[in-house]
């Protein structure tokens, strides 16, 4: 049997991983500027953590979750999204306590799992960057969080991103709209897809989110939820729009956008860009003021977003964005002979401890092959160690581009390599 990775997963090899690390580092730096701290939650949770929060009728729960019973007969699921585990952790660790400064700002980077058909930018194991902010109902929190995502895209060099915005209002607004949508869709029930016929009974707002052609036709003239916002909901949405305009962040109102999760209220948003003439959602999120209470905590407003790393990297690649990933070595040590093998080990460690990236030959190859490796690794400096260098206590350093050489003592290399390196590459 030929052993291969499971369908819908990938091996991220070093060249690609360097790009992943760069994007993750930029995200971390950006979030730190907004005073977010990192949180790491388990890759698996109790089934109810996801099903109760995401929604029993969502596609994630009904079709896509990797769930199983463990040896203790506990119903477990691999996490399909990041918000519910973070909210569970917020409540379990009592981050709502008065001594904890509010708002509590958290970010995460990690693997998520959904059983769905693998396609470009969508895998069964995917990696998500997300943020959650707890304790502020201020519309400025909505806008700051959206602006943070926008700031991240700017720093990465992504172009052509459009902010799509909508409001689901509060519970009263949503209930009124739910009934209006049922009244509108019920007469055309038989024209809907099978999934949307089920959604009409369980959660009619899900019909607006359908990608099926017949459902898109059916909802084309559906009533707008914005017509059902009560005074408080309208004031919140107006404030969000006003603040976005104050920050010069362009947006479009998308009344058919409802998000694929049941816990949202008030502001929801997506950042969308175009790749190969197809629209791709690059980031999505919104407000969830009831979720902490649903998990047994006190009433606590929340706002957050998630974005897929694979999709983000795909868009960067399609837009031709060159990430400034560091390549190459500072130093390559060519080794000739058994005595030099030991000396190379000591020199390599000494140079590394001074902050330089170093590689050496381990295979006892001819010098020409070793120099070729130095070129392949894009080494800036090559140090040659042979029997004569060992006897003299000196090494020959060569600039790998200009081929200029200099001879220095082992003592100098071990104590002040920075000065030697600077002189060699100048």
Curated annotation (Swiss-Prot):
CDD domains: HisRS-like_core (cd00773), HisRS_anticodon (cd00859)
Any one GO MF annotation of this record: transferase activity
EC number, as in UniProt: 6.1.1.21
Pfam families per UniProt: HGTP_anticodon (PF03129), tRNA-synt_His (PF13393)
Gene Ontology terms: biological process: histidyl-tRNA aminoacylation
Similarity-based family: Belongs to the class-II aminoacyl-tRNA synthetase family.
Subunit and interaction comment: Homodimer.
UniProt-recorded name of the protein: Histidine--tRNA ligase
